[in-house]
């Protein structure tokens, strides 16, 4: 229930809702006694999130708003041409077919009879399906309370602590922006709303106006064979292809070509009082003809930053410096994709005293974005393609429970002492997660965009035991040659201006898993309605050192160095009384 009071509704999470429509049909069919088919079709319509008061905005290069005519080109709002209240249209053509097949071989003689075990001993299954997902509400959270409906302003220069709108060096005012009154969508005064108070726009997200609904294609094939009355073996292939996945990319990157041209011309940087253009100068104003300020009005001899994608010439008269769109402006796009393929082997046994499940997976996952904030390369999304951040190539897990039959071994002993003993555990051996490579501090690409600059790969990657001495390893924390997981000599900082580096951002794995959790339980039945449990548990019982991934940031002094580990052995004792 809405109270009408914003803070109260926010605390109670009132007023947040979503709309989603779907319809489906399934048909079951048995072709023969041992053949079974399931077909289905689902229709999905999921509306993107929107603000009920229309207080949203989007970024569309070169488009001028009619809702707020004085806003800079590139900034648009619901009601502008091609911009619905949901920013992206609700699409109604999302049809998701699916089919499943099952077959139980009936061979009883010959080689096939031995392979399949006879009638009713083996089941072969295959399936394919398309599944849509709704758009996560985090995408709307990124859009709300941005200009002109909220004010997030970053000073381009150092300011005084007590008066943060005054330049520390000169004492000159760059404009007091607070407090301010947010406009009301549809008000007549919006036609003359002054946007200079919001400029420059930094860390300003924009939801793609052509976004679609993410979906996945799922497919699998499995053979399940009964080995005995209590044991089943399963061999399976599992695959998933993700399409139109939500991700982010830089909306207004710096132009490397423009920066290098300014550098070749030895243009005067009016912001830093230097000559030439290089890393970190995407938001600076350059005078191409004289070593002089560009003035308050637009000057055709000046270049207003190298970020020209959203708005060219990217000039805003009220901004300081006079750049409309600065750093951290991103698109939320549905242009990511993924592929996952896995082979699986599972053995399961369920007996009176002993139960276990053992599974091994050999898999590979690739994508160009593993998460919402895993930025895609704005120039070419294929440059971001690599191992998924969750990729684990080899993964073996076994779980087991053994009810120890002391009562059968010591038949003359009291039942309360010999019954109720149980040991259980989970053992895992697995390769680690991929190491994320980057070169975060140098801005060699001249793009001013996080997550896209990479080091150069200059040799094969060699992984080593961080507990041992390794030539080629230098640990700045100890001054020794231990602690490396991979030797840094395989990489070098990229120094070629205007390029992204040659290393893939995720292409090899970090330290793996070697872990066993073990527990022992003794249940004592005191009376028909009373029982007492005593449980002893150990996590990582063998106390294996399981290192976490080192940093893959070549600008970090700990590049390739293991600095943390997962939990050591932890033991606990607990008791529980039942009545």
Give the predicted meaning of each segment.
Residues 20-55, 69, 76-147, 395, ...:
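Structural signature of Gram-negative outer-membrane beta-barrels, strongest in the C-terminal barrel
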Residues 1-2, 100:
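Accessible peptide chain termini
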Residues 119-160, 243-249, 424-431:
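Surface-exposed extracellular loop regions of Gram-negative outer-membrane beta-barrel proteins
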